[in-house]
Amino acid sequence: MSDHQNRGQDFSLEADSELRFEIEQKDAKVLVTLVNGFAELFGTELVKKKKYEFGMGAKVAIFTYQGCVLHVTGKMDVCYISKETPMVQYVNCHAALEQFRTEAEEKDRRGPVAMVVGPTDVGKSTLCRILLNYAVRVGRRPLYADLDVGQGAIAISGNVATILIERPASVEEGFPKTAPLVYHFGHKSPSGNSVLYNAVVSKMAEVTLQSLNGNKRTKSSGIIVNTCGWVKGHGYAHLLHAARAYGACAIFVLDQERLYNELLRDVPSSVHVVLLPKSGGVVERSKELRHECRDQRIKEYFYGNARAPFYPFSFEVKFQELRLYKIGAPPLPDSCMPIGMKAEDNKTKVVAVTPTPALIHHVLALSFAESVDDDVIGTNIAGFCCVTEVDMERQVVMLLSPQPRPLPPNALLLWSELQFMDNHT
């Protein structure tokens, strides 16, 4: 590191501007300190004189409404100040949602359900984070529903999930992932099984909307829904399905006029559809980077991070004790289906999986369902484990798990296409 990087640099930001930087180097570390003024990261206020640490993969945009001075130390691949920022429009969206919440509170009704939609890499997760942070800063307790199975902001990829947001996100680590409601999907894109995807979205929407009635504060706070970046063809149909399932009253469309006009045409006129610009700081991610991000999320699930390391367990399970299933059977023509069944029904069929070496590295979901006779699709997930070894001779699999052996009684494991190479040393 050069002397300049060691000493750091002061950045003076005018009102309504932001400091943007990216870190791509694997072992790079950047420290940011708010020297004076007021600033925030995606809706979370920075504390003066406190050092914030960012590592590889960080794409940071620190915004100020009033002006501030930031001290930055470390090696960044990109770093600049921008006065072109959509933050004022985003805070206007928050203000509109607050009007809905106030009205809901007065009339004891459900608060607003707002969906954030748009193609990949336009900042959907970031806008959700901003809206959620602003909501809790004024005393709300909204729910955050994440339907993006490709990246996963709450659970690991391949799942849909919901959490209650009670405090602003940590600047460095985002929202705490405590007590999420997670439903298994098992694929990195809704295209992996469109019928199943709609089924789990419907189930999570049903359970989430019911849960609002249990707490008056949360009921009036409503839900922010994050979505996948697949917005054409079947992907667009999934967006419409989610909007109906959640009863969305507002849809924020990021950076695509075509999608905005399609939604204006296809959703009820009572739904507020708003076109918003993406931030100039949003960066397009390569296929490789997306894969790395998915891998990192799974690694953090098992091993934590430098600030809060976890120590997972490895243990063997005999084939005969392994109750492993997959949701979705190979497609068959209607002529080969049992009477009364359609080919679509096969997409939600629960089928047994025989352990083979092909199972190595696959992530498995541990369902709260106790039997395949239960509603497996409609039952949420307790956690995840990963197959690190399959010994055909001894008829055992080796599992990496956050919990020690044994597996819970009647444990029902669900296959997913997600894989994780456990190279942790």
Curated annotation (Swiss-Prot):
Primary location recorded for the protein, binned into one broad class: nucleus
GO biological process terms held by the UniProt record: mRNA 3'-end processing; tRNA splicing, via endonucleolytic cleavage and ligation
Keyword Nucleotide-binding attached: yes
Gene Ontology cellular-component terms listed: mRNA cleavage factor complex; tRNA-intron endonuclease complex
Any one Gene Ontology molecular-function term assigned to this protein's record: ATP binding
Cell compartment(s), UniProt: Nucleus
Binding site for ATP: E18, K59, D121, V122, G123, K124, S125, T126
Keywords: ATP-binding, mRNA processing, Nucleotide-binding, Nucleus
Pfam families found in the cross-reference section: Clp1, CLP1_N, CLP1_P
Cited PANTHER family: CLEAVAGE/POLYADENYLATION FACTOR IA SUBUNIT CLP1P (PTHR12755), POLYRIBONUCLEOTIDE 5'-HYDROXYL-KINASE CLP1 (PTHR12755:SF6)
Family per similarity comment: Belongs to the Clp1 family. Clp1 subfamily.
Function: Required for endonucleolytic cleavage during polyadenylation-dependent pre-mRNA 3'-end formation.
Name of the protein: Protein CLP1 homolog
Species per Swiss-Prot/TrEMBL record: Drosophila pseudoobscura pseudoobscura
Gene: cbc
